[in-house]
Design a protein with these regions (language model features):
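Flavin-dependent oxidoreductase catalytic cores
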Residues: 1-227
């Protein structure tokens, strides 16, 4: 569904909600700055007048705190109280700009974004990420930052950015991340069948943790979105 969302914008979510239903939350394509300004297309995609789904969560992508602040100020002015920050997009053009998975190799930059979130206590921030940008061990430096942050949910796609969507997802790495992460966790990646959803979290049961445990989400714009 992601290609359709990029082509047709918010109308895809409206149609899916009206015809199919059963989706807890819809996450938008990236809201981002272009030459210092929010794109008109992005403004339309998150316009309250254009959206009738019960729960729409804007997804933003940023490389520095000031960029995140501009995006958050705008979305808060539109009445949003949930924002998802993408640190997982693997596409080279995004990565080269230090956004998406391109930020994961720089823990200090990730920490700066997490600190900016604290400036907006009225907003519930979530984070979407991968195991790393270039190395599957990079997450180990990031989990302590997430545990100290105000994020309310982490979505993990267990590949590195360099892989994009090639190769197998690393379910054992997801398990290790789960054991280290103190935030509610969502699994994302290669969920094509019901069996994939049941087995996708590396045999982690939500019952193993007293909080929200783990959930599985697809890459369609419903559930966790697009890392």
């Amino acid at each position: 569904m992601q290609p359709l969302c990029r082509l047709y914008g918010s109308g895809v979510a409206q149609c899916t909600c009206a015809v199919l239903g059963g989706v807890d939350a819809y996450y938008t394509p990236f809201v981002r700055l272009e030459k210092g300004e929010i794109r008109n297309k992005d403004r339309r995609d998150v316009s309250p007048e254009e959206n009738t789904v019960p729960r729409l969560v804007p997804q933003v992508i940023a490389s520095d705190p000031e960029e995140l602040k501009v995006l958050t100020d705008f979305l808060a002015s539109q009445g949003y109280r949930e924002i998802d920050v993408n640190m997982g997009c693997p596409f080279p053009l995004i990565v080269r700009r230090g956004k998406g998975a391109g930020i994961l190799s720089s823990p200090e930059k990730v920490e700066a974004l997490l600190e900016m979130m604290k400036v907006f206590p009225e907003i519930r921030f979530s984070v979407k990420m991968r195991l790393g940008g270039q190395d599957a061990e990079e997450w180990k430096a990031l989990v302590p930052l997430l545990n100290r942050s105000c994020v309310t949910q982490v979505t993990l796609h267990p590949r590195i950015g360099k892989q994009q969507y090639k190769g197998a997802v690393d379910r054992e790495a997801f398990r290790a991340f789960y054991e280290a992460c103190e935030r509610p966790l969502v699994y994302n990646g290669d969920l094509l069948t019901v069996a994939d959803i049941r087995g996708g979290t590396g045999s982690v049961s939500p019952a193993e943790r007293g909080d929200a445990g783990t959930r599985a989400a697809d890459e369609s714009g419903a559930g966790a979105g697009f890392p």
